[in-house]
């Protein structure tokens, strides 16, 4: 009995330190948010660049630290709905690797919608980024795009954030 308890304790200790495997991200679904845009003359259109990091370098350039990314798309208006028209995800080399929002979606006042890039999805690399096209009625309150990168491995943890910048083209 004593041997059995000792073995059980050893197994529990060893497995509790094991890193949990991240599941593959589910397809990003927005069909319940798809909408037709109001007339173009009632909207201001814009574009925002958001830097993210699928991984960062640790010790040297061949050793990386994988990160989970949460992209937050925030409507900061208290009264007007905003529209996300399109979103593209690019890797470090600038290659488009994924497309989000194939049809316009709405974000209600003070609402946030999110995209999660799983920790084991390193396709974007250390210089990944998004470009979002959007439309708003209230020119004073453009959407806010933020990303939070996080990893907790063993006893180490790292987290940081980035904020989108409007681009004009």
Model-inferred region functions:
Residues 25-47:
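Post-signal peptide N-terminal segment of mature Sec-exported envelope proteins
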């Amino acid at each position: 009995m004593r041997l059995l308890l000792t073995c059980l304790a050893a197994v529990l200790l060893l497995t509790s330190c094991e890193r949990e495997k991240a599941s593959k991200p589910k397809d990003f679904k927005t069909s319940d948010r798809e909408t037709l845009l109001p007339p173009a003359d009632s909207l201001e259109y814009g574009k925002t660049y958001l830097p993210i990091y699928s991984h960062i370098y640790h010790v040297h350039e061949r050793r990386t630290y994988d990160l989970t990314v949460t992209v937050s798309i925030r409507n900061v208006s208290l009264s007007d709905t905003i529209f996300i028209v399109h979103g593209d995800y690019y890797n470090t080399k600038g290659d488009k690797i994924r497309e989000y929002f194939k049809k316009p979606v709405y974000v209600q006042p003070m609402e946030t919608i999110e995209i999660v890039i799983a920790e084991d999805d390193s396709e974007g690399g250390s210089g990944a980024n998004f470009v979002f096209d959007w439309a708003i009625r209230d020119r004073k309150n453009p959407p806010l795009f933020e990303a939070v990168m996080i990893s907790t491995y063993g006893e180490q943890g790292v987290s940081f954030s980035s904020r989108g910048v409007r681009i004009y083209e």
